Amino acid sequence: MAPAPAPAGSADQFRGQARLPRFAAPRRYELRLRPDLDACVFTGDASVVVDVSAPTRFLVLNAADLAVDRASIRFQGLAPTEVSLFEDDEILVLEFDGELPLGEGVLAMDFNGTLNDQMRGFYRSKYEYKGETKNMAVTQFEAVDARRCFPCWDEPAFKAKFKLTLEVPSELVALSNMPVACETIAGPIKTIHYEESPLMSTYLVAIVVGLFDYVEGVTSEGNKVRVYTQVGKSSQGKFALDIGVKSLNFYKDYFDTPYPLPKLDMVAIPDFAAGAMENYGLVTYREVSLLFDEQSSSASFKQNVAITVAHELAHQWFGNLVTMEWWTHLWLNEGFATWMSHLSVDSFFPQWNIWTQFLDSTTSALKLDSQAESHPIEVEIHHASEVDEIFDAISYDKGASVIRMLQSYLGAERFQKALTSYIKKYAYSNAKTEDLWAVLEEVSGEPVKDLMTTWTKQQGYPVISVKLKGHDLELEQDQFLLNGTSGAGIWIVPITLGCCSHDKQKRLLLKHKHDNIKAIVSQCDSRQKGGNFWIKLNIDETGFYRVKYDDELTAALRNALQAKKLSLMDEIGIVDDAHALSIACKQTLSSLLHLLYAFRDEADYSVLSHINSVTSSVAKISIDATPDLAGDIKQLFIKLLLPPAKKLGWDPKDGESHLNAMLRPMLLVALVQLGHDKTINEGFRRFQIFFDDRNTSLLTPDTRKAAYLSVMHNVSSTNRSGYDALLKVYRKSAEGEEKLRVLGTLSSCQDKDIVLESLNLIFTDEVRNQDAYRVLGGVIIEARETAWSWLKENWDRISEAFSGSSLISDFIRSIVTLFTSKEKEAEISQFFATRTKPGYERTLKQSLERVLINARWIEGIRGEAKLAQTVHELLHKP
């Protein structure tokens, strides 16, 4: 039977709604919070100026995991007649005797809660101080967890001003979004009053209380910037401080809008679920995303700190000053911050070739968006629990990639001018995706909305098939799906085309399924024989689509590759497209191997990084698809990657480039994983020296992962000395990066007992919940059954320990995607049939689809008659 409709006028009418009603909105919050870090609880009181704009007897706001003192609730002196807390909906409904007066009134209430250990809401994080374990109090409110700290209108569109007061132990540092206005000390407790904030959304309110050191800088406008670290680690904050100051200066100039707050603090938090969080004026980070130590940090971690800081500070404009109206438009926050971070870091470190590395983001988005279980950039959100799952490669990486495509189409100058207008128009308020398109259209005069709606409102992207017919070029678009089916989508595609030259470009908009470019051959230099004629679509991979060439054009491109006629970005695009077409069984694995072989003299970090991803993927699938050939395929890839690895060696060279410093460990790790004996033996030798002398120059931070994997290569239950040595390194290391490095290798082993021991570390105090993904990510194909059995046996425990956190998705994704058969997909589906929750439902569906995609790819590979011949031919080629 269907449930009866809620009686008119009852609190039940507000249940099951995606959003809060609009008849009342907060204008200003006065909050006082008293965290008790020993008892891990907090008390608080709120006084909220509420504007009632339509006749109502109700006030409806969000609250969750809080005890609200019902007797304390008053609105303009009136006590509610009914107080209903609906836990599933996370709403608090206050019902009054008569209609509330229109206009502004004050809602007051007291409440209390627990400083939880779930890394959301108002929570506790453990740290060591002088040999003692202490708690700090931290907030993490995005997306929907401010309601776990204080009752509020917890939606981005309800912007209000915030005036915070904290009562904390006198010896502690207490930070919030705004600077301290005044402070009074009464014995062991100090009361800190903060300045009132400008209009802002609840998810950006932040508090951090603990013991900290800091380093300080100042922007060109005089804004004070600080990086707070655990006591004794402040020198590790200097690099992030430098990037922070430079980023604020860069964005101020780019948007022609000053940083809106008087100060910016960045704080390293030991327990932190995300990589970082852009709270207005008080940005919080995982330690490894903020701290950099010249002695113990690798080049890739240094780059990660720069990109992460630049990303979070871009949010101070795109997200905080101008905020998305609802979570459907999350991509406006994350896509733009991702794109802007590359723009700014490229200006700080042009030698890093960061835009070439940006293609990692595009590849990641193309991979997810070629699944039927992907979602549009603009995704409908019906329940708070669904929001966490869209903080994914679509919102971040596809968002950033289509922004890059649009900037390329409009031109950098027009694009910047439009963004500046947009920021100024919507400052201190909210915007939807359409609002951005309207400003871009107004400034550029181009049909931006029609073009971009095809990319943000529909899921997926096209593959453009290119055929040479006489002197003409035929183009056809189809939705690209890895499962081999074809969707019905049609996109307006900004096509760029290079003919025999990177510089001679043709541009057009492909608006229909088919198009013809007439006399393309005569427009290029005359069609020469001898391999000089070639055509490349999607120059520098600025477009978010794949390209499939006919045989003649494919051969010509391979020649152009070998003759080094293409840009690095174009080389990457060709490799990634060929890999995806192979997985989708639209091209043979043999043709992919021939293409990879054309890169045998490659030396560039970004290109080799993508080749390494492809060789790793093919090596793994070959274990199941062609077990007899798997060894030879690995040898072929060793042949490909060994020359650049030999050239770089294990030891860094004086004055070498940042990119070579990142290339060395990537190649060494790849060779170890492919089973190259010499590399494994050398890694093991260097580890033994390092284990006895941590200061040896023979194992730098960059090359340690390769050495650790070399150690694990020979570990078993009967030969566990290497494993125990790595555990000792883990336990003795004070640096977060070093701990992560070891964690990522401990489960990289075929031995069942060792794998289980490593996975069970997740349940101990030795591994912080935020780092569990590292252990999971290390599991190799040969140990997948062990890991799957462990996941099933421990699912209830995992669900409890990681509930309410996006981290639970890591368990599913890491283990499920190791499988490649329809039978296994059915078994896993059956297990989760009664265990799925909205917080990880999308991840589970995507992971299961990936299993079926792999199963189909295996069938395709097994059907290739000439694969063995190709492998042996390439393997024995001089």
UniProtKB/Swiss-Prot annotation:
It is found in: Membrane; Microsome membrane; Cytoplasm. Pfam families: ERAP1_C (PF11838), Peptidase_M1 (PF01433), Peptidase_M1_N (PF17900). Substrate binds at residues 142, 275-279. Its main location: membrane. Its cofactor is Zn(2+). It is a peripheral membrane protein. Keywords: Aminopeptidase, Cytoplasm, Endoplasmic reticulum, Hydrolase, Membrane, Metal-binding, Metalloprotease, Microsome, Protease, Zinc. It catalyses: Release of an N-terminal amino acid, Xaa-|-Yaa- from a peptide, amide or arylamide. Xaa is preferably Ala, but may be most amino acids including Pro (slow action). When a terminal hydrophobic residue is followed by a prolyl residue, the two may be released as an intact Xaa-Pro dipeptide. Binds 1 zinc ion per subunit. The record marks 396 as: Transition state stabilizer. The active site is at residue 312. GO terms for cellular component: cytoplasm; endoplasmic reticulum; extracellular space; membrane. Its EC number is 3.4.11.2. Zn(2+) binds at residues 311, 315, 334. Residues 102-209 are annotated as: Required for membrane association. A motif (Dileucine internalization motif) lies at residues 726-727. Homodimer. This is Aminopeptidase M1-C.
